[in-house]
């Protein structure tokens, strides 16, 4: 029981400390998300993967796991080349949860102006490396069905 109290005290203390000053981190994460949106709309796979950690990975709906920047860059370039040149992509943050001062889970919603998929949602793990927030893992799911 004593160990549980210590663990809870440490967790509560960490949560209290990390809750302070999150505004700047949330703004940086939202700016990172805007950079992803911008790179995708430019069809710039290199710029997209630069927003991931070197060993980052992604799984898009029912597709394979893509790990590492080189793999994601080549596969992403092929995916982006298949997009209609007039299609626009928007990405919005729907939730941010900080696990530590340098790790956050970010929920997003995406919209597409044309094509067979008009919306999806994603969950990513962002880590702060050298002062920059980067995606360590991204999972993309179909959009939530209307109730």
Identify the function of each model-found stretch.
Residues 57-67, 80-85:
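A short gly/proline-enriched turn/hairpin at secondary-structure junctions
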Residues 119-146:
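Short beta-strand edge/turn micro-motifs at domain boundaries
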Residues 4-15:
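Bacterial N-terminal signal peptides
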Residues 71-119:
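Surface-exposed, charged secondary-structure patches
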Residues 52, 62-63, 95, 108-112, ...:
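A mature extracytoplasmic/lumenal domain signature
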């Amino acid at each position: 029981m004593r160990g549980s109290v210590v663990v809870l005290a440490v967790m509560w203390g960490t949560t209290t400390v990390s809750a302070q000053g999150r505004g700047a981190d949330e703004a940086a994460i939202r700016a990172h998300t805007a950079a992803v949106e911008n790179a995708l709309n430019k069809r710039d796979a290199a710029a997209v993967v630069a927003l991931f950690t070197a060993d980052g990975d992604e799984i898009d709906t029912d597709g394979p796991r893509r790990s590492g920047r080189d793999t994601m860059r080549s596969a992403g370039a092929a995916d982006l080349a298949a997009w209609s040149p007039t299609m626009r992509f928007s990405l919005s943050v729907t939730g941010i949860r900080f696990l530590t001062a340098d790790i956050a889970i970010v929920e997003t919603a995406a919209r597409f102006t044309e094509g067979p998929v008009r919306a999806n949602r994603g969950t990513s793990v962002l880590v702060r490396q050298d002062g920059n927030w980067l995606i360590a893992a991204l999972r993309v799911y179909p959009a939530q069905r209307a109730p």
